[in-house]
Amino acid sequence: MPFAYIDTSSEAIKAFAGKYKAKTGQDPNSAAQYGYVGADIIVAALEAAGRDLTRAKFLAALEGIKDYKPLFPGPSLSYGPDKHQGSTATFLAKVEGGRWKVIAENLLY
């Protein structure tokens, strides 16, 4: 997922960044972005698994996530019994003016 610079991001990302900075005293970095997406997927799976949680229900819920759209830029993620990677797409970026700039998206591998 490309890095989302706060000053050029959506209002939802700006809200995330504000909450993150209020808690940590720092602006979010790429690890924070990946961590947010990972945690959000876990929460979605826990909610889908229901209150009578079992390992089997949790795994089935994780593997049932389809077309999850992360808060941050990047491809949608889908999982299944034989698909645990989420996406088979990547992107190509270069540094321009001291910032990462995406020059190609959804490159399949």
Q: PLM features: what roles do these ranges have?
A:
Residues 1-109:
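Extracytosolic ligand-binding ectodomains
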